[in-house]
């Protein structure tokens, strides 16, 4: 027999709901700047910049110190632990710079994947041990939301029922712990684009994954109005020979979400999944314009698809500050427009914005 557990007070629920709504108000999205040291190193290597703490700090300072108008397009920023405690060149904490712009500060909380025994090289996510204590400390340090990424892949045998259930339950436990500590949980069940599967198969798998996630969230008494969902857009595998239009991607994506995601969820903040900057924007715009019911706000939580052009413009040189910040602002504004179905592709995008950002078995 089911029993009610008053896990959250009305005041806690109100705070969580208000934070979630503030992040995605008026087409705003999220900058995912939570890359680990290793992942950031891979990106710096591509522009021939050494992976040092100072170089990582310098690039992120360029992103966070843009004009205050960025707050019209970006409502939240996800930070890595290192970045949360870093300062700009004047000695001001990055998190305080963001807050002064009216941007909500978030933190990456998962600690990467671990092999899931009894499966074909599938994984579960680490980080639940000590999570409550970490959340409590982050809340004291000015953080208002968290992110937890679970990864599933498509192949002949994957994802297995075991992997789906294990990752769904880990996401739900994380979400419950976050809310107990005043953090809005971003729930991120990512189905990787690796493989040669078609769009229809991706939709089938994604519906199974999302249904399991929301069953688990319900089992763990998670307050849906105080959460955000960060799913992949539904696309064919990177090696699939058949190509699909943004409108086809949009129809499959919204259909799957409509079948599985409760209307109580405030917003769906899509990840870019290795698409080029321009494709991520075009697909988001098409999803908004899809002629199907959408009870949730549509938004974005992009990392590579907001930073690729900026990183290329920077090249590790302080003299490129203006070009770097302009490139970042351009993508932020474009995605804010797309989240409201107002983006118009002009065909004038730079080379960096049209380059695929796909990385096999991508990890943060």
Curated annotation (Swiss-Prot):
Where beta-D-fructose 1,6-bisphosphate binds, per the record, is at: 43, 272-274, 304
Q: Name one GO molecular function term.
A: ATPase binding
* EC number, as in UniProt: 4.1.2.13
Q: Which residues carry this modification: Phosphothreonine?
A: 39, 119
Q: Which SUPFAM superfamilies match?
A: Aldolase
**Lineage top rank: taxon:** Eukaryota
Residues recorded as bearing N6-succinyllysine in the entry: 13, 121, 317
Name of the top EC class for this enzyme: lyase
The active site of this protein is located at 188, 230
Gene3D superfamilies registered for this protein in UniProt: Aldolase class I
Q: Which UniProt keywords apply?
A: Acetylation, Cytoplasm, Cytoskeleton, Glycolysis, Lyase, Phosphoprotein, Schiff base
Which biological process terms from the Gene Ontology are attached to this UniProt entry?
A: cellular response to insulin stimulus; fructose 1,6-bisphosphate metabolic process; fructose catabolic process; fructose catabolic process to hydroxyacetone phosphate and glyceraldehyde-3-phosphate; fructose metabolic process; gluconeogenesis; glycolytic process; liver development
Pathway annotation from the record? Carbohydrate degradation; glycolysis; D-glyceraldehyde 3-phosphate and glycerone phosphate from D-glucose: step 4/4; Carbohydrate biosynthesis; gluconeogenesis; Carbohydrate metabolism; fructose metabolism
List N-acetylalanine occurrences by residue. 2
Catalytically driven reaction(s): beta-D-fructose 1,6-bisphosphate = D-glyceraldehyde 3-phosphate + dihydroxyacetone phosphate; beta-D-fructose 1-phosphate = D-glyceraldehyde + dihydroxyacetone phosphate
Q: Name one GO cellular component term.
A: centriolar satellite
| List of residues that carry Phosphoserine | 36, 89, 132, 272, 276, 299, 301, 309
The function of this protein is: Catalyzes the aldol cleavage of fructose 1,6-biphosphate to form two triosephosphates dihydroxyacetone phosphate and D-glyceraldehyde 3-phosphate in glycolysis as well as the reverse stereospecific aldol addition reaction in gluconeogenesis. In fructolysis, metabolizes fructose 1-phosphate derived from the phosphorylation of dietary fructose by fructokinase into dihydroxyacetone phosphate and D-glyceraldehyde.
What does the miscellaneous comment read?
Answer: In vertebrates, 3 forms of this ubiquitous glycolytic enzyme are found, aldolase A in muscle, aldolase B in liver and aldolase C in brain.
Family, per the entry?
Belongs to the class I fructose-bisphosphate aldolase family.
On assembly, the entry states: Homotetramer. Interacts with BBS1, BBS2, BBS4 and BBS7. Forms a ternary complex with G6PD and TP53; this interaction is direct.
Protein name according to UniProt? Fructose-bisphosphate aldolase B
The protein's organism comes out as Rattus norvegicus (Rat)
